[in-house]
């Protein structure tokens, strides 16, 4: 299992005014990356999910990989991953993303309050977040890493619609300017804290800006390495 975490985090790293009143992280890209209106957003996400096919997956889901571009570009693709959660009941969801806006040293773990979207609040699993932070000095809470970051925010409406009648909490983790051993540090921490009620979401767009055939080649190589547990 530890190899899976290492591969997924390595994959993520290859892509490459304050709003914390009352410990609520306000939406940064509502109305831009996805609809800012509650009803419109719910309808769009529901349509994406309705058009996605659920695969016949054997065994327990440990993690999903999802893109984080605007819904116009990647919403339907993201829905295919989230569709696989149908029938599951994860209580704790760890979401890992790169940092697109804030340069910082370390791995920032958001450990208090809630994230807000037009669909409502998503609570932070503070106990789990602090357990992760306690594992290594590379784990910190750097608020600026999360202030404008879209890569975690855009995944939340899918969770809110998939799990709209269920109680779940999240642990947002954003990677800064990683050192070579950060992949191992995070993988080891995840291995220690995750249980059968925990899902890992890797928010990553894979290849960018390539012609279609080249993008398929690169992304197939990446997914093939994951399937083979090839950490090299």
What are the residue ranges of the model-derived segments?
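Active-site histidine-anchored catalytic micro-motif
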Residues: 20-232
């Amino acid at each position: 299992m530890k190899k899976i975490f290492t591969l997924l985090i390595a994959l993520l790293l290859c892509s490459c005014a304050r709003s914390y009143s009352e410990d609520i992280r306000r939406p940064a890209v509502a109305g831009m990356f996805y609809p800012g209106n509650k009803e419109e957003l719910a309808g769009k996400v529901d349509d994406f999910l309705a058009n996605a096919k659920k695969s016949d997956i054997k065994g327990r889901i440990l993690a999903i990989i999802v893109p984080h571009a605007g819904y116009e570009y990647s919403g339907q693709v993201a829905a295919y991953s989230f569709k696989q959660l149908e029938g599951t009941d994860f209580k704790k969801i760890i979401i890992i993303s790169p940092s697109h806006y804030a340069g910082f040293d370390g791995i920032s773990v958001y450990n208090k309050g809630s994230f807000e979207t037009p669909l409502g609040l998503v609570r932070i699993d503070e106990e789990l977040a602090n357990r992760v932070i306690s594992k290594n000095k590379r784990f910190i809470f750097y608020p600026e890493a999360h202030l404008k970051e879209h890569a975690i925010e855009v995944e939340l409406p899918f969770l809110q619609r998939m799990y709209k009648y269920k109680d779940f909490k999240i642990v947002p983790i954003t990677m800064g300017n990683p050192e070579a051993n950060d992949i191992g540090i995070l993988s080891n921490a995840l291995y220690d804290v995750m249980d059968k009620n925990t899902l890992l979401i890797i928010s990553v767009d894979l290849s960018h800006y390539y012609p279609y055939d080249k993008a398929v080649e690169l992304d197939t190589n990446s997914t093939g390495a994951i399937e083979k547990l090839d950490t090299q």
